[in-house]
Amino acid sequence: MIRRRVIVHGYVQGVFFRDSVRRLALRYDVNGWVTNRWDGTVEAVLEGESEAVERVVAFCREGPRGAQVESVDVSAEEPEGLSGFSVG
């Protein structure tokens, strides 16, 4: 199991970014959360099997239709055993 914290910069709010991440995370059995931040970025914490988490991270680099991802910061963290996936 791995954990990644992802910060997505660009035009990423108001384009169903969070819901798209949630749906993909549920499809790949990835736990965690995603939220809009005050500075216009989207932040996500993802936990699960390596391949599944990396698929969601790869999606974050592209985003849904309508998003314009400028950059993505990804950091590795120790898994905490999160359960479920929430949108904030």
Language-model features and meaning:
Residues 1-88:
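Intrinsically disordered, low-complexity, mixed-charge
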